[in-house]
Amino acid sequence: MKTRHWSVLSLLALPALSQAEAITGEVHRQPLNIEAIVMFVLFVGATLYITYWASKRTRSRGDYYTAGGRITGFQNGLAIAGDFMSAASFLGISALVYTSGYDGLIYSIGFLIGWPIILFLIAERLRNLGRYTFADVASYRLKQRPIRTLSACGSLVVVALYLIAQMVGAGKLIELLFGLNYHVAVVLVGILMVMYVLFGGMLATTWVQIIKAVLLLAGASFMALMVMKSVNFNFNTLFSEAVKVHPKGLSIMSPGGLVSDPISALSLGLALMFGTAGLPHILMRFFTVSDAKEARKSVFYATGFIGYFYILTFIIGFGAILLVGPNPAFKDAAGALLGGNNMAAVHLADAVGGSFFLGFISAVAFATILAVVAGLTLAGASAVSHDLYASVIKKGKANERDELKVSKITVVVLGFVAIGLGILFEKQNIAFMVGLAFSIAASCNFPIIFISMYWEKLTTRGAMIGGWLGLLTAVILMILGPTIWVTILGHAKPIYPYEYPALFSMIVAFVGIWFFSITDNSEEGQQERLRFKAQFVRSQTGLGASQSSSH
């Protein structure tokens, strides 16, 4: 039960981040899928043309980091959805609904909870105070160098963990869907990722994410429509027929079958809720619009698209119970689903649309990976070039050309690192990295951004000590927990008994920031508190905020 519980949680631990959890363990390679490969080549061709087009329009630092602030709220909402909806969500949640029914809906709603937090607490102030990265906001009235160093470290750790999970997941997913070799798949994803970001910057990344979101929503909508058509558009029929054919019977309509440990569940819930508001590649998207109003619209549209997508995955999961489960064509000799339960949605695509639509859905799953890794790579590169190189090493005196050069070098380095780690971690269950990435985002990035915008008494000392404590607590508790301490390191019992650290590491971060700020009586601390009023005015009004013209 414990292993199953972990595998389910890890499967879903991140929508935006990881096909890895959707495809953990051994992969059964499928036959070469010609339709899928043709459609994927068409997608790559189209996106490479977009990259060429974007490269002609990417001239300045602002163009490269934020597409010059010229993306509209609607476009950005679609791009955020494209950045957030992963193959893990599409395959993983529909697979969870296929195996466990109603519990799948609970998990998918969990992913949505973080967006109202971003809408009401983060989006407008972030856009008014920042320019290229969230470190601009965190360091607005505090000491630039230490805060930017901490923010960049938090960003890079999250990006690195996500990238490893993405690359391993990408290799396994492509091996599973296309029949391609794992190493070939990882290298292919790495090369395409570098090309998008290196030449097209944020503009190319945005349009890759928009196209991917449209394709994924269109494909999932068609699948859900065909499922509903098969039951005459009657939900009662869908559910009652599913109950009849599912091995678990009526229990698939009840919640609570997956979570045996409430502390781990609460910790995961907190990480999902608040970690979303600390993901660097998501936060960076708010600087691509012209003002706070468009930033707010972005979240509104993104929430709508993401919510709609999770409703579709629920219908797709029940459709798979009905149309895939009883069909022997999709089973092996032992009666198990071909390719594993994570293939439920892919088999449903075959059942409702034939081999052509199966090829389309397989290609969309690959496109999903490319869109997510491109956003991650750009976020990592900007943390190095803008926060570490320009602001810390050069103390704000770097010229634009050098900063862009550093950013592009970082993109290439990240590409090599991602490919290398993807190959290195091929046989590992890398699901714990995803939980750790979200926990770090919730324990380090989110507290600093949130408190810097809302609490007048915050000082550099408090932010630094509390932020580092949150980050280190999350990492240490994860190492001492059951996944690493027992499963990987081979000890008999875990020192920290729960799966996720966010419940405790967030408390450590917030208490640390509060305590070390209120006990800071230095002159610098007093000055930082006095600068809050000017920050508050700008965060509310946008007066003095960087406009697209200044990018």
UniProtKB/Swiss-Prot annotation:
Cell compartment(s), UniProt: Cell inner membrane
Keyword Metal-binding recorded: no
Superkingdom of source: Bacteria
Listed Gene3D superfamilies: Sodium/glucose cotransporter
Signal peptide segment: none
Matches recorded under CDD domains: SLC5sbd_u4
Protein's membrane topology: Multi-pass membrane protein
PROSITE patterns reported for this sequence: NA_SOLUT_SYMP_1, NA_SOLUT_SYMP_2, NA_SOLUT_SYMP_3
This protein's UniProt keywords: Cell inner membrane, Cell membrane, Ion transport, Membrane, Sodium, Sodium transport, Symport, Transmembrane, Transmembrane helix, Transport
GO terms classed as biological process: plasma membrane acetate transport; sodium ion transport
Function: Transports acetate.
Family: Belongs to the sodium:solute symporter (SSF) (TC 2.A.21) family.
Family matches, as HAMAP family: Acet_symport_ActP
Protein name: Cation/acetate symporter ActP
Taxonomic classification: Bacteria, Pseudomonadati, Pseudomonadota, Gammaproteobacteria, Enterobacterales
